[in-house]
Amino acid sequence: MSILFDSNETIYPFPPKPRPLSAEAKQHYRSRIKTLLRERNAVMVAHYYTDPEIQALAEETGGCVADSLEMARFGSTHSASTLLVAGVRFMGETAKILNPEKTILMPTLEAECSLDLGCPVDEFSRFCDEHPDRMVVVYANTSAAVKARADWVVTSSIAVELIEHLDSLGEKIIWAPDRHLGSYVQKQTGADVLCWQGACIVHDEFKTQALKRMKILYPDAAILVHPESPQSVVEMADAVGSTSQLIQAAKTLPQRELIVATDRGIFYKMQQACPEKTLLEAPTAGEGATCRSCAHCPWMAMNGLEAIANGLEQGGRAHEIHVDAALREGALIPLNRMLDFAASLKLRVKGNA
């Protein structure tokens, strides 16, 4: 069973686009960032959806480019005393929850996520209280307060496996906040899932009819889709998965052309994984009134070179993540469950190899 919680659709105001930098300015900030990372004993942790030059800098300086699960793992095991998280705010909060002794800096604390914004803790807590017989599973794209209200935190890379596990134990589920991913895992597992009505502003814009027209132009291309996309788009896919799973699919699929329905920031690592293949952006209807994000998260785009340099140099209120101690303790429980479950999955996969 899958029921959608009926909340009002919200149009979120987007941040202004970062000012473009000259080649000389970019080189200045890259050099400054490298120096500041050394001086602060810091390491960069960047998400796949940040701009290519940010991902390249993270790699060049010994940092990490990954999905949110691997970002969490990397930050927990690295020896640096400071983590510079290039992503959105919930990623910085997660890093602080898992590493309270470390300084967590972000280029800006105003980098939001529509899934986080669409799941306010007071409203969500009331919803959970109305269904006390259900296990509460929340996506990593949520605030520390929402995580603290949950029994489990999950990323898209292990969502199906976790819901299968809970279903095998006879659990009924509350899933939040992404309605498309919740619907996808329900269909994959047959579990009893009650979905909160949230959506990613990037993936929600992929259009079935436009994708069909693109497939006519590229009939031999494979279609890769993130499960935060609408069901009708997911049903057209040759491969469905998280960011890391889509990169792996790009490597292993035989097709030489790939239509990719996720944030175009992923193209940097995906092209590294299969340089011989042609990557094509799935249509969102193009620039203009019919698309707002146009396949790139506007908050991820806030993680520019200038902002990163400022974050490392200035720190303080505008850049440092703090999480209340009691809230951290509450959120750490479901986060550790996620990490332990993910580790057990890896062991099981190795055991079956």
Swiss-Prot record:
Signal peptide: none annotated. The keyword Manganese does not apply. It comes from the Bacteria. Keywords: 4Fe-4S, Cytoplasm, Iron, Iron-sulfur, Metal-binding, Pyridine nucleotide biosynthesis, Transferase. Binds 1 [4Fe-4S] cluster per subunit. Iminosuccinate binds at residues 47, 68, 139-141, 156, 226-228, 243. HAMAP family: NadA_type1. NCBIfam families: nadA (TIGR00550), PRK09375.1-1 (NF006877), PRK09375.1-2 (NF006878). This is Quinolinate synthase.
